[in-house]
Amino acid sequence: MTDVTTIHQPVLLRDCVDLVAPALAKPGSIAVDCTLGLAGHSTAFLKASPNARLIGIDRDTEALALATKRMEMEGLADRFTPVHAAFDDFSQVLSDQGVDKVNAVFMDLGLSSLQIDETERGFSYSHDAPLDMRMDVTQPLTAEQVLAEYSFADLVRIFRAYGEERFSKQIAREIVRRRETEPLTTSGQLNRLVDEVVPQAHRPAGNPAKRVFQALRIEVNGELDKLAGTLPQIANHLAVGGRLVVESYHSLEDKTVKAFMNQGLKVDAPADMPVVPPDMMPFFKELTRGAIKADAEEIANNPRSASVRLRAVELTRPIPARWRKRFDQGADYASMTRQGRRD
């Protein structure tokens, strides 16, 4: 059995506990960890909140097994329910558990140490491995399939949208050319291809393939679509006083989280409206001033924390019916920026 306590360092653990635990003080409180991983954060939440129980969601069956074992070792298994699911099944998971409202929801959107360190997953550009990149190995789409089957236009789209890659067209063109004679099946092959395409003078810090690997991982796992679809579900299941705490690791995730939270932090009325109706008042309270970042000491101890952005809000009143309807319908909340409206 893998020793999860040594391979996994939870990012900003103290900050996360300080944000989550106050919402779990009452007997019967329920927390949901949407990205359970190896349960580093979740074990800390339960230890700090003896009156609470926790539902842990993960699409990675190996991580679920290790997390469950860890809970047993920590004596927390009686307050822990593991669920194999993607977090965009949030509402269904709660329904299956007979739960409607929850008091705290946590999301750590980074890769777990298990996924990074087990080279056969193909997540890391530092090791030569099959191009898999599935967080849930029961799902069909792999990174190898994306590279083999996507059109030039679709490859450009994902590298540009999900990797913010400046040389998307050049990389996609070389992939399409090369795959006609040599299938791209390993991370080493992809590394070498990107290394040949991206000019030395225009390389970001670190491995030049970093953005391409990020884009492929997001595409294979549908990460941004799942995040955008999950946040409204979470809001509709938060109890008043409940908290949503999210750690993101790249700008696309952070922008999505920020845009969603901002909906409930602002007055939803035109700036020239003389009297604002109650249902247009904010329903979230910001718990972090902007985003919390890792300090130099944490980065030195855990380099994976360097890019983290931690945001949190508390639900201060029931969500207005029209916002609940938008959330239920899966509205494109990112487009609902209320320009010219009250802050």
From Swiss-Prot:
It is found in: Cytoplasm. InterPro entries: RsmH, SAM-dep_MeTrfase_MraW_recog, SAM-dependent_MTases_sf. Its EC number is 2.1.1.199. S-adenosyl-L-methionine binds at residues 39-41, 58, 87, 108, 115. Keywords: Cytoplasm, Methyltransferase, rRNA processing, S-adenosyl-L-methionine, Transferase. GO terms for biological process: rRNA base methylation. It holds the Pfam family Methyltransf_5. Belongs to the methyltransferase superfamily. RsmH family. This is Ribosomal RNA small subunit methyltransferase H. The lineage of its organism: Bacteria, Bacillati, Actinomycetota, Actinomycetes, Bifidobacteriales. The gene is rsmH.
